[in-house]
């Protein structure tokens, strides 16, 4: 095919040339479902292209490095007709099966990556974006806005996990809640509610609630403190404690009148350790140059070095690491 013919084909199908020249853009386009509010569609599509590059690079590096992909794909036996109680119970059961402990939110991201083969990426997202679920035939990915409060991040991660586990039976829309008609809107609303109940059960199972003990004299401060222990928001924990009969319903009324300051929590490192490890190996093996890796991650070379340090990953020798890493 000649260059003019190629350009004609690209123009006809409205496909950018980079789709064929950039090795990190997957030929099998990832499916995304975004959890967002008030984002400009064009900006969101541009950000999605960046996310597709990160995902594509992670996959291609894995193939070139001979790293096995998970042959198992986890699913959740729920449908949009399932009850909220069933969704909550499924979340709680998964917390036990994955051995997330008494603070599931603190362990969820690591367990999703280590035991479920799901890539988690903490990203600097556009304003209004909380997170996204993305799936390919051989990889599931959860993207989370790392600049959200910890409780929101963990809830979004659990919510996106639900979508990844139910993608075949309840495929989410590109935008959460996007519907073509009233009937579809009702169904999608139900699915989102099921996702929220699953997330609540996963992050706040009965065992974790019981481990909190009895409320202190200042219920508002006690709930706020225990929410920090679990890695959830005080409001979300308040609902669960009321359902469990541990605190009175008046708590929600009182807390809405008396706004509590958000707890300051540390910003999680960019991307994730598995992503950083694979990127470092790719640089060491000559699969990508340091400068190209900086462009891929949208970081300066110095910031990329700090990325490896933040995740406890040894820097490649070309970035000041030991020479032995290239062996």
Q: Which residues does each predicted region cover?
A:
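Short juxta-domain linker segments that transition from a proline/glycine-rich
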Residues: 1-327
